[in-house]
Amino acid sequence: MFDEPVSTREYLENYGAFMIHCGLAGLGAPGPDDTHPLHGELPNAPFQKAWLEIDEGEGTVAVGGSYRHTVAFSTNYLATAKVAMTAGSALLGVSLAVENLKQTPMEMMYLAHANFRPVDHGELHYTAPYDASAVRVRTSIPAHISPKPDYMAFIETLARDPLPHHRMDPALAFDPEVVFSIDMMADGDGLAHAMQAHPDGTADYIGFRPDQAPVCTRWVCRTPDQDGLGIAFPATAEVEGYTAEKAKGHVIELAGGATWCIDISMGLLTAPEAAGLKDRIDAVRNG
């Protein structure tokens, strides 16, 4: 719906980026007792600094930027983001570091909103048990969506068995959106993996460390106007808003002067790379 970025802090008025850092003072759809905007203050924040890093020896180029967010009697942090590319790879290295500039603790929540395009008849593979206890569909309806009459019946089906959503069947009712919370497992290197395998053998991929992002959300949106797939959103909290997530124990307390970091890999895999990753995912799942 958007031809180019829009200069606004409103989340839904500048939408469609491949990767959006969400948080930090709030996250998700605000509940009735919340005051934060949808997905917090970070998504469209006006970064004060930006730079390029080029390493010819390593064959890498990175774009970096920093944003300082200060609210008197409340919050004072520095967020430093970076996106790196390496020659010969179609994967991006995405990182964020959040430094609490206060002397006192800071509450924070984070989610990496990485948006791929759903591919008709693509298949989802990821390091988690494929059952309703580990792949939990959201049954509440946030204020920013208006579901169709058959929506809740589809949600009830997925609540019993999440397997039908693994294939990107264009007939499935992902309109306007379906959201899951997933208990991801790490491999021997401490990494969780998720991918959308394309019919041609290539795949979209995202990988992260659950010790940095212990919560994982999946988002699927397939409408006549918008088509998006969050294969796996690395996060520290689910998306029910600050008050609800605080009650779940999902709000981090970052000590004064401390820094929180996350490192994510995302992008496109060749067919041989995708086949190898599928084997790694199966090995983790089969334990």
Give, region by region, the residue ranges found by the protein language model.
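Surface-exposed acidic/polar loop and edge beta-strand patches at domain peripheries
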Residues: 1-87, 91-93, 104-107, 114-287
